[in-house]
Amino acid sequence: MSRTPWKSQPCEMVQPSGGPAGDQDVLGEESSLGKPTMLHLPSEQGAPETFQRCLEENQELRDAIRQSNQMLRERCEELQRFQGSQREEKEFLMQKFCEARRLVERLSLEKLELRRQREQALQEVELLKTCQQQMAEDKASVKAQVTSLLGELQESQSRLEAATKERQALESRVRATSEQVRQLENEREALQQQHSVQVDQLRLQSQSMEAALRMERQAASEEKRKLAQLQVAYHQLFQEYDNHIKSSVVSSERNRGLQLEDLKQQLQQAEEALVAKQEVIDKLKEEAEQHKIVMETVPVLKAQADIYKADFQAERQAREQLAERKELLQEQLEQLQREYSRLKTSCQESARIEDMRKRHVEVSQPTLPPAPAHHSFHPALPSQRRSPPEEPPNFCCPKCQYQAPDMDTLQIHVMECIE
């Protein structure tokens, strides 16, 4: 740090009032150091009064010179003390100026860090938007799979109805066959001796017919069992989906909550830095006001004060820009929160559809066995076994257990319930 040159104030020497020119030639002068000079006497001797007066004036001159030297020394010491105090004040001001500059640099770094964090948050928003688009596409594919699943369910229901109708037809044929068997039994009682061989053949045919009937009943029972398993799988699918949605929502909210807490903490740190900076600036401003009178006497310090004032104005503008930046970041934070809420809702919907699609794929892997071949048979011997009573079809929603009157109503309700 270069030292500021000081201009010493001129100190005027006290000049004693001298006598006439002839007296100055007679008496000698004393220098500023107080050394007496040779006294030159004229060739002619003066009166005693004149000599006495010259001695008195010489003594007065010496006293005046001594007083002038003493005042000059005091002035010099005072000037040195003043220069030392001014130098200390200058060093103090330069130290404060360096501290303010370091504070400005630190705030600039914090500003760059906040800008980087904002860019990172924008990148995360873009990534979430991309995920949302992907989930929308997955949602469309899942809807298509649900539609195909409902078509398969309707097809299996149609097959079950066809099997039920075939079973009813078989039971009708069995009843007709039973009537014929009773008639043959009456004839057998009359013609037992004559048609023993035919009776044995008819008995064999009756046994084969009973076996075919048992196979048909087993096939119908298997169809009912598969339908019940499909309904249970649907119910379990939606229960697992609800559990998965709850766990995913809790984890997503926890992660977003941590990110929001980090952003709020960063904003609070920025506010505290701005408050501390304002306090430092106010303190420096008060100190500048206190030293304003002294700085007016020193041109170099005045120029430095002008530079400091310009830096202060720049600092104020930077503080205002930081305040505007803070408001902008607050608005962006609120916008990100709204975007997060919207994306969270979309993610929940997409996760629900994705989980349902996975469950549908797992459930739809075991294919339904083909319907058993219907064996044609001829009337045979009577049978004592009767078929169990027919069970009505159960059109039940696997999610809310809604009982539908028919298959079309169930299909419409399942689509609405899933959406």
Curated annotation (Swiss-Prot):
Positions carrying Phosphoserine: 31, 43, 68, 85, 376, 387
Region (Interaction with CYLD): 382-419
Sites where the protein binds Zn(2+): 397, 400, 413, 417
Region of interest: Interaction with TANK: 150-257
Site feature ((Microbial infection) Cleavage) residues: 349-350
Processing and modification events after translation: Phosphorylation at Ser-68 attenuates aminoterminal homodimerization. Polyubiquitinated on Lys-285 via 'Lys-63'-linked ubiquitin; the ubiquitination is mediated downstream of NOD2 and RIPK2 and probably plays a role in signaling by facilitating interactions with ubiquitin domain-containing proteins and activates the NF-kappa-B pathway. Polyubiquitinated on Lys-285 and Lys-399 through 'Lys-63'-linked ubiquitin; the ubiquitination is mediated by BCL10, MALT1 and TRAF6 and probably plays a role in signaling by facilitating interactions with ubiquitin domain-containing proteins and activates the NF-kappa-B pathway.
Keywords linked to the UniProt accession: Coiled coil, Cytoplasm, Disulfide bond, DNA damage, Isopeptide bond, Kinase, Metal-binding, Nucleus, Phosphoprotein, Transcription, Transcription regulation, Transferase, Ubl conjugation, Zinc, Zinc-finger
One Pfam entry name: NEMO
Major location category of this protein: cytoplasm
UniProt note: domains: The leucine-zipper domain and the CCHC NOA-type zinc-fingers constitute the UBAN region and are essential for polyubiquitin binding and for the activation of IRF3.
Record protein name field: NF-kappa-B essential modulator
Organism, as annotated: Sus scrofa (Pig)
